[in-house]
Design a protein with these regions (language model features):
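Conserved, well-structured interaction surfaces
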Residues: 1-63, 81-119
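A solvent-exposed, charged loop/short amphipathic helix patch at secondary-structure junctions
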Residues: 145-164
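TPR/Sel1-like alpha-solenoid repeat signature
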Residues: 128-134
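Long, well-ordered core segments of solenoidal/helical folds
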Residues: 101-109, 178-188
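Short coil/turn linking the two alpha-helices of tandem helical-hairpin repeats
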Residues: 60-61, 67, 137-146
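Residue-level detector of conserved catalytic or cofactor/ligand-binding positions
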Residues: 192-202
Length: 202
C-alpha cells in the first residue's frame, strides 16, 4: 500500500516539484532561443504550462493541499525562509491548475490531437480531459466538505479543506466532461467498448 511512510511518498513529492521548476525555467527562458520560430516557441511554452499543471494535479491527488510556487522558480541560492512555503488550500490549488490548463487550451498553440507522430506531447484533448478529471476530484467527498480534514490547517489557522459541501462543483465537473466528450468525439476519439458476454475482450 501507499501512504505517507512509503519511500515513494517523498520521492514523488521531490520529483514533481523538480519537474515544476524545470517547466517554469523553460517558460521564462525559451523566448531567448530566437533560432526557433515564434510559433514553435509558443507551442513549447503552452506544452510546458500544461505539463506543469499536470504535475501539480498529481501532487494534489497524492498529497492533498500543496504549496503553489507560481511563475518564478525558486532560485538555487534561496534562503531557508524562501524554501519553506505554506500550503495553499484545495480550492486555490484547483483554481490554479484549471486556469493553467485553460490558458494552454486557449493559447491556440497546442495541437488539437497529438496523434502518433507526436505521442507524449500535451494537446488540447489531453488538457480538457485533465481539467474534467480535476473538477471531478474537486467535487468528490474527498475534497468537497470533508469534515474529517477539519484539523488540517496552516500555522496561521488557514483552513485547507473546504468544510461545506458545494454541489455546484458537481455541475462544473459535468460540464467539463461534456465539453471534453464533445470535443474528443469531433477529433475521432471513441469510447472503448466492452462485450458483456466477454468482459476481457476489448
Amino acid at each position: 500500500s501507499f501512504n505517507s511512510a512509503s519511500a515513494q511518498a517523498s520521492e514523488y513529492f521531490s520529483k514533481y516539484y523538480q519537474a515544476i521548476a524545470k517547466a517554469s525555467t523553460f517558460i521564462q527562458n525559451v523566448d531567448k532561443c530566437t533560432e526557433a520560430a515564434a510559433s514553435t516557441r509558443g507551442k513549447w511554452k503552452s506544452e510546458a504550462r500544461a505539463l506543469r499543471a499536470y504535475y501539480y494535479f498529481e501532487l494534489l491527488r497524492l498529497y492533498g493541499p500543496i504549496p503553489l510556487i507560481g511563475e518564478d522558480p525558486i532560485p538555487l541560492d534561496a534562503s531557508l525562509e524562501e524554501l519553506i512555503k505554506e500550503r495553499n488550500s484545495v480550492d486555490e490549488c484547483v483554481n490554479f491548475i484549471a486556469t493553467e490548463l485553460q490558458s494552454a487550451i486557449d493559447s491556440g498553440d497546442l495541437l488539437q490531437r497529438a496523434g502518433k507522430a507526436n505521442l507524449g506531447r500535451m494537446d488540447v484533448a489531453t488538457c480538457m480531459a485533465l481539467k474534467a478529471k480535476l473538477y471531478l476530484y474537486w467535487a468528490s467527498p474527498l475534497f468537497n466538505g470533508n469534515t474529517d480534514q477539519a484539523s488540517v490547517k496552516n500555522k496561521d489557522g488557514k483552513q485547507l479543506f473546504p468544510q461545506t459541501e458545494d454541489n455546484s462543483k458537481w455541475a462544473q465537473a459535468r460540464d467539463a466532461y461534456e465539453r471534453f466528450m464533445t470535443f474528443a468525439t469531433g477529433q475521432g476519439y471513441k469510447l472503448s467498448l466492452i462485450h458483456i458476454s466477454e468482459p476481457t475482450r476489448p
